[in-house]
Amino acid sequence: MQKAAARDKRGCFLFGAADFIRKTAASIKLQLHNLDNVKIADIIFECRQCQDWRRIVRKKMVIIILCILAVPLVLLGVWALMSPGKIRTYKESDSISGKFVMDINGAPNGFFINGKYKDNPVLLLVSSGPGTDDYVFTDKYKDMKLEEDFTVVYWDYRYMGIAYNNNADADSITLDNLLNDTEAVTNYLKERFNKDKIYIMGFSGGSKIALMEVQRHPENYYAYIGMAQCVTDSEENDTVMYNFMKDVFERRGDKKNLARLEEAVTHLDSGNIKCNDWYVYVDLLHEAGGGTIKDKSEFEGITWPIITAKCYTLSEKIGYVKGMKMYRKTKLAEETDNFDYRKTITELEVPAFFISGESDYNCPWELVRDYCEMIKAPQKHFYKIQGAAHSPLWENPKDTCRALREIKENTLYG
C-alpha cells in the first residue's frame, strides 16, 4: 500500500511537473510569438520609414538638379535680354546710325556708323588688336561724343567682331589683304558719303595697318591720327614697360607682382629687357594702372564691357571672342610683330597727329612722343591726355574730342 501510495504521489508530482512544464513552454512560446510579431512590426515600420526617406531624398535631388540646370538657363536668358544688339541713335533728322556686315574683297566686314550730321567729315577708326572691335567702348562709355564732329565709322575687319562666322577663312587674314581691305573700305566711304577724302585713325594694333595704308595711299586722307600708336616691337618698348611696372610695384611694396614681373622677362647684356610672356606682361600692366583703362583690371576694362554691351546680340558676343582668339593665331599676327616704324616709316605726305594717355605703357607714350618729333609731315602734333592710359578717347573723351576737333579745324580746309 505504501509503495502504491508512493507511486501515486510520484505520478501526481510528475503529472504536475509535466503540466507546469507544458504551461511554461506555452507561455514562453506565446512570449516568443509576441516578441517576433513586435520585431517584425518594427522592421516593417523601419523599412517603410527608409522607403519614405529615400523618396524624399530622391525628390530633393531632383529639385536640386533642376535648380542647377535652371540657374545657367536663367542667367543665359538675362544675358540675352541684356544683349539686344542695338546701337546709338539720335534725334537729329540729318543723323545717321547703322550696323551692318558687307562683303569687302570677298570676305565679310562689319561696320558701326554714328554721326549726328551727314555733312561732317568721315572718320574711319581702324580697330585695335588687330582683331578687337572697339565700338564696345563707345557703347560702354556714354560721355564720348565724337559723332558731333565726325561721321564715325568703326570697322570690324574680315571675320572679326560682327563679321565673324563659323566658315571664317583664317588663312586669308594677312597684312596684304587687310591693307587692300582698308583701301576698299576707304573708297566705299568716300563714295557713300560723297567725300573726296576722309580721316583715318588707327587705335593701338590698328595703328600699324592705318599708318602703312596712309603711306601707301596718302591721296585718300586729310590726315593720319594715331591713338595709342604702336611705334616699335623692339626690346626698348619692353624696357620702358618694365621700368614703369617695376617702379609702381616697388612703391606699393607689391612683392608678389614684382616676382611675377621678373619671371616674365630676361635681362639682356645690353641693359635692355626682353619680354618672354606677353600675356602675363599685359596683365601686370593692368595691375600697375597702365593698361587698357587706367586703374582697371583686364576684366573690368575689357571683358566686362564686352559681356554687358548692348550693341551686340548674344551670338555676336560669342563670335567676338572666337574672332579675337582666331586673329591671335593668324599670319597677320606674325607679320605685324618685330616692327620699328622709326626705321620703316619716317615720312608722311599728310598731316600726322598722335594721341596718347599720360599713363599708357601698353604703347608707351614717351616713344610715341619721340616718334612724332622725328617723323616728317606737313603738320604734326603730339597730344598727351590727362587721366587716361591706353584708351584716351573713352577714358577722357572731353579732352580727346577737343584734340580731334582741333585736328579737323587745322586740316579740313587747309
List where the protein language model places each region.
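A catalytic-pocket lid/entrance helix-loop region that shapes and gates access to the active site
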Residues: Y222-H267
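Short beta-strand/loop motif that positions the catalytic acidic residue
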Residues: L348, F354-S356, D360
